[in-house]
């Protein structure tokens, strides 16, 4: 059974498909946070063209956020999953085993992140929205000048019709 999360943002909607079998703990954390409304009204605090868009921190600083397991939880690095191109859904962290609520979506191949960040899904639809986000004007700290934010995140279980 596949789990999708639909994000309505200030720039349009996109859907991610979660890799429950490769990163079960990470996917459970992400889906539960989305279900609880944790990501609603959260900004994309870091956008780097041709690299990635990052969000998931309710403080909007890039230093906040926590998981459903408490503070931080361990990586689930799967050798078969690589940051091979645009649309990879991966956990942001501050070193090994420091996953919380922040995540990013790649805009290009980022092989230097392989083995360092937990890949737990991919963009299933709405990649154009992500690509447009990657083009917004940012300041010297990679923060969008005009706010880009998640309006609402909604979990959709396939086969729930």
From Swiss-Prot:
Catalytic activity: [protein]-peptidylproline (omega=180) = [protein]-peptidylproline (omega=0)
EC id: 5.2.1.8
Top-level division of the source organism's lineage: Eukaryota
GO cellular component: catalytic step 2 spliceosome
MF-aspect GO terms: peptidyl-prolyl cis-trans isomerase activity
Entries under SUPFAM superfamilies matching the protein: Cyclophilin-like
Coiled coil (residue ranges): none
Residue ranges crossing the lipid bilayer per the database entry: none
Residue ranges constituting the PPIase cyclophilin-type domain according to the UniProt record: 1-155
InterPro entries with a match to the protein in the record: Cyclophilin-like_dom_sf, Cyclophilin-type_PPIase, Cyclophilin-type_PPIase_CS, Cyclophilin-type_PPIase_dom, Cyclophilin_A-like
Gene Ontology terms: biological process: mRNA splicing, via spliceosome; protein folding
Gene3D superfamilies membership: Cyclophilin-like
Keywords carried by this UniProt record: Isomerase, Rotamase
Family: Belongs to the cyclophilin-type PPIase family. PPIL1 subfamily.
Function recorded in the entry: PPIases accelerate the folding of proteins. It catalyzes the cis-trans isomerization of proline imidic peptide bonds in oligopeptides.
The protein's name in its UniProt record: Peptidyl-prolyl cis-trans isomerase-like 1
Gene of this entry: cyp1
């Amino acid at each position: 059974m596949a789990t999708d999360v639909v994000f309505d943002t200030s720039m349009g909607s996109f859907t991610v498909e979660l890799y429950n079998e490769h990163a079960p703990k990470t996917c459970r954390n992400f889906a539960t946070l989305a279900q609880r409304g944790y990501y609603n009204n959260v900004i994309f605090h870091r956008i780097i063209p041709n690299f990635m868009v990052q969000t998931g921190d309710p403080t909007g600083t890039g230093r906040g956020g926590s998981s459903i397991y408490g503070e931080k939880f361990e990586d689930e690095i799967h050798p078969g999953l690589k940051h091979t191109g645009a649309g990879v859904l991966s956990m942001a962290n501050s070193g090994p085993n420091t996953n919380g609520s922040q995540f990013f979506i790649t805009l290009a191949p980022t092989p230097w992140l392989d083995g360092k960040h937990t890949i737990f899904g991919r963009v299933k639809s709405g990649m154009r929205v992500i690509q447009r986000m990657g083009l917004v004007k940012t300041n010297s700290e990679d923060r969008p000048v005009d706010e880009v934010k998640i309006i609402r995140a909604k979990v959709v279980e396939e086969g729930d019709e």
